[in-house]
């Protein structure tokens, strides 16, 4: 059980709170879990609007969009953000700071520079050196060294950290509320020979095009197959590039609620994750497993690891639509084998439940707080001020 000694915990989310994403979900779920356990939690995050923010979230200002790791990240950086970060730290009286993705230009990096004392950094990114954009290296290393402890959400994220910054981390996976998905209801409209996909489907690295390229071969074996796509995006633009004879079997659902997602994952014949890269964990895979879904995913390192190298789900060669089609056909042809693997995956998914994951994170917090220090403001550094474009009187 998590210790009942109440702590004041500051968590920094680097990405815009209003934009759906794995890091935002992780931070929000962790904050709510810690609050329910009796701790005082404040989350600092960029936000497009102060309206409808949870009570525990403090806006650091409006984010801007930058390309990052094959996607668009909405982050906040610069002298005004630095001042807001310092103010939040000075008012927080925190026992520990938990900074997510402190190695990219964001408020997490600013908080790492601005604070002294117990600080834990969680690293989510997984990418090859040439594909990832970390902050300016001369400023990074001394900042990252200030972290008392480091967490990576997967072995893939840990390897990225070791490769880029030559430092190590404890692996603690992302968490899910497994019971929410375990109790999903089977809905006939999504069941049968159906393929499910959830994500920002117009983002190339999410891989929807690979699933659609596999579809003709799948249809030739299973003429009744239907594809259901949930998530934000322009469905009309996507339908335009799909063969006309296939369009009537592809259904775009738009955004769905958490309850609908649990039912969707419970119901679909196969859940397909054809992502091409840039994934360090795969929360949606853990949620799908917890729902009892039969998962087919690309063999990128994070997905392959999460699926136990094929024990809890099926992998196909990344970006190979023909291999994906073969795997789908084989699974639809052998329902008993498919369901047996899904049953194992559902049991395994309990290891990602917040009851387990939050306990591990709090163990890291305790290690960071072992010296008894509180979080305080560091003195402003003139070279950092110069980097931010502030007046240094030089």
What name fits each language-model region?
Residues 4-6, 13-18, 27-28, 32-80, ...:
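N-terminal strand-loop element at the rim of the active site
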Residues 47-49, 198, 226-239, 254:
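Glycosyltransferase donor-sugar binding loop
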Residues 156, 175:
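Carbohydrate-associated surface elements
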Residues 187-206, 212-216, 228:
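Conserved donor-binding/catalytic core segment of Leloir-type glycosyltransferases
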Residues 239-262:
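Nucleotide-activated donor-binding/catalytic signature segment of Leloir-type glycosyltransferases, i.e.
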Residues 294-297:
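Short hydrophobic beta-strand element within catalytic cores of glycosyltransferases
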Residues 309-321, 330-336:
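Conserved acidic donor-binding segment of nucleotide-sugar-dependent glycosyltransferases
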Residues 323, 330, 337-351, 363, ...:
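A short, well-ordered alpha-helix in the C-terminal region of glycosyltransferases
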């Amino acid at each position: 059980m998590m210790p009942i000694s109440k702590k004041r915990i500051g968590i920094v989310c680097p990405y815009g709170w209003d934009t759906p994403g794995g890091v935002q979900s992780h931070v929000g779920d962790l904050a709510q879990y810690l609050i329910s356990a009796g701790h005082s939690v404040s989350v600092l995050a960029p936000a497009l609007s102060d309206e409808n923010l949870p009570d525990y979230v403090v806006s650091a200002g409006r984010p801007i969009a930058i390309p990052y790791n094959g996607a668009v990240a909405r982050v906040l950086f610069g002298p005004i953000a630095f001042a807001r970060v310092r103010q939040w730290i000075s008012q927080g009286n925190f026992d520990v700071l938990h900074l997510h993705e402190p190695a990219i230009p964001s408020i997490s990096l600013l908080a790492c520079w601005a604070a002294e004392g117990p600080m834990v950094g969680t690293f989510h990114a997984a990418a090859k050196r040439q594909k990832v954009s970390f902050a300016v290296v001369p400023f990074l290393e001394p900042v990252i060294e200030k972290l008392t402890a480091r967490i990576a959400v997967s072995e893939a994220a840990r390897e990225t950290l070791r490769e880029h910054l030559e430092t190590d981390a404890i692996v603690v996976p992302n968490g899910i509320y497994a019971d929410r998905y375990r109790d999903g209801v089977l809905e006939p409209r999504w069941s049968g020979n159906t393929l499910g996909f959830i994500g920002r489907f117009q983002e190339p690295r999410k891989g929807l095009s690979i699933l659609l390229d596999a579809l003709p071969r799948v249809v030739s074996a299973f003429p009744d197959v239907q594809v259901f796509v949930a998530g934000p995006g322009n469905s009309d633009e996507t339908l335009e590039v799909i063969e006309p004879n296939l369009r009537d079997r592809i259904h775009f659902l738009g955004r769905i609620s958490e309850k609908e997602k649990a039912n969707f994952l419970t119901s679909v014949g196969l859940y397909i994750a054809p992502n091409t890269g840039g994934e360090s964990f795969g929360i949606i895979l853990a949620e799908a497993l917890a729902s009892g879904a039969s998962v087919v995913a690309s063999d990128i390192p994070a997905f392959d690891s999460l699926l136990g190298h094929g024990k809890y789900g099926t992998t196909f060669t990344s970006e190979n639509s023909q291999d994906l089609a073969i795997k789908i056909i084989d699974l639809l042809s052998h329902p008993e084998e498919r369901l047996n693997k899904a049953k194992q995956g559902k049991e395994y998914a309990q290891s990602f439940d917040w009851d387990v994951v939050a306990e591990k994170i709090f163990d890291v917090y305790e290690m960071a707080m072992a010296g008894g220090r509180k979080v305080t403001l560091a003195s402003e550094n003139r070279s950092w001020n110069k980097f931010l474009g502030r007046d240094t009187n030089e």
